[in-house]
């Protein structure tokens, strides 16, 4: 929305947010890491957008006075098998032009993280942390400043065509648009279905659970410490993450959520769960990764 108004200042842009405030879900419920582009296949869209996104995010944070802490990241190998995987990651990182990335010995990694230990590590000094809630609010402020509208509490319950236009029904009434862009996060497939579009890729909700280090133990972690990821699984593994507010997270795991917005074990929405269990792709995923639990 912000970019559209920059390119087309005469456009009338409206953002519909179903919650009463911004960043209530994925945007505000992550570890706050700004990844540098280490893991992605060189030349892929993910790699390209990651590096471009880092540049744009730094500019936005500087403009709005949002703290952008370049704390750095270590990916630590503990044995020879992991060391081989680590060197493959290093090759990817250099191909993706990640700034300053290098391999460090076990002794050198202790200079960076005195309380860490390992055989070898990949050091990415440009990896950063940021408050993504503040980022979302800054983007919304620019949309409003550019003449756009950001409406909270505007859950879209119906989409229908009316001639060449699209009509969106919300609790406050109907809104008519010439064009509609769906960016609905965990509900992306269901909102796409409302629009009559292909709902693939389908959403299977997983919840990541973290521990917090006690305040008197936070000094043990200066930046970000990750394991070498297992390429057989679609997760980066349990890691140590310093946040923008000074807290240090340990995690996450990845457990099947019983609701799309299921942030605790007791949150169960039968419609969401039934949708997951009825989709054949979920069972393919389960068969492929059942050993992880």
What are these regions (language model features)?
Residues 17, 70, 104-106, 152-154, ...:
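Short loop/edge segments at beta-strand edges and connector loops
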């Amino acid at each position: 929305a912000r970019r559209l108004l920059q390119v087309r200042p005469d456009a009338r842009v409206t953002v519909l947010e179903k919650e009463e405030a911004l960043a209530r879900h994925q945007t505000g419920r992550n570890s706050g890491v700004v990844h540098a582009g280490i893991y992605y296949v060189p030349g892929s869209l993910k790699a390209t957008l990651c590096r471009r996104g880092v540049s744009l995010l730094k500019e936005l944070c500087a403009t709005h006075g949002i703290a952008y802490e370049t704390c750095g990241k270590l990916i630590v190998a503990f044995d020879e098998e992991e060391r081989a995987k680590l060197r493959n990651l290093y090759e990817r990182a250099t191909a993706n032009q990640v700034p300053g990335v290098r391999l460090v010995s076990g002794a050198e990694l202790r200079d960076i993280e005195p309380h860490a230990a390992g055989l070898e590590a990949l050091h990415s000094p440009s990896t950063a942390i940021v408050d993504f809630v503040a980022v979302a609010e800054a983007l919304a402020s620019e949309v409003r400043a550019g003449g756009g509208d950001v409406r909270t509490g505007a859950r879209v319950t119906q989409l229908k065509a009316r001639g060449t236009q699209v009509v969106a029904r919300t609790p406050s009434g109907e809104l008519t648009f010439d064009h509609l862009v769906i960016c609905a996060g965990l509900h992306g497939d269901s909102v796409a279905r409302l629009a009559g579009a292909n709902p693939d890729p389908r959403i299977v909700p997983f919840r990541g659970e973290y521990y917090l280090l006690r305040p008197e133990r936070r000094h043990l972690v200066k930046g970000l410490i990750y394991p070498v990821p297992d390429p057989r699984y679609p997760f980066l593994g349990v890691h140590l993450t310093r946040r923008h507010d000074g807290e240090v997270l340990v995690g996450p795991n990845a457990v099947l959520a019983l609701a799309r917005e299921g942030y605790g074990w007791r949150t169960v929405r039968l419609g969401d769960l039934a949708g997951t269990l009825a989709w054949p792709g979920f069972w393919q995923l389960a068969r492929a990764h059942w050993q992880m639990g």
